[in-house]
Amino acid sequence: MRTLIREDLEAARDRLESLTAPQRLAWAFEHCGDGFALTTSFGIQSSVLLHMLSRLPTGHSVPVIWVDTGYLPPETYQYSEQLMELFDVRLVVAQSSISPARMEALHGRLWETGDVVDLETYHRIRKVEPLEQAMADHGVTCWASGVRSSQTDHRRSMSWLDPIRDRLSLRPLLDWTPRDIYYYMQEHDLPQHPLFEKGYSTVGDWHSSGPDAGELSGRETRFGGLKQECGIHLPQDAVEGLMGDGI
């Protein structure tokens, strides 16, 4: 990421505030060129940002990075095939250098211990490190994701554009509501994730996701209630000590 003085960053945020979500994507590509990428989880709302990207004249040249932990539900893998065919994306699959079986042999089933430190180790191995490696391999300086401010306490503190681990993180949908997502998908006839009809409002790994139930909804259903963020969207100082060498 090029060095930004605070005035540059604030000016960019002010500009992004006045744009629509698709225009924010176009702005990022215009300013970052080949250094721009998009991340996707092929989750409940993923079709929205992929659809917006596909409608940009240069959209098909933008790398779309998907962190495949090896623990996603079968429905997510099926949905990913559907969306890849629909949008013809330039997909980059980011995976850990250690297989799920090897990780479990060395570290156990980290998501079953009820210890947040073990969850952080799991997320570092299976999510954060693979994403950072993929971004480094593709020279990414700015990446867009579909996070929204209403999802978690941490995300309420986000702005349109923030530095994260030596790159810029763009949030085109930051001010969108679940209703905005739903109506956009209806307007453009976008397919729903199969688990949406089973009560899921968010989905990640099979062992750390569940349908909305009772007072629990959204990100509260993730990670056994121990945490709401996997580390991908956290700043450097929040993950120092968890990251591996060279990340």
Cite the ranges covered by each PLM segment.
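Nucleotide-activated chemistry modules centered on ATP-dependent adenylation/adenylyltransferase
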Residues: 1-247
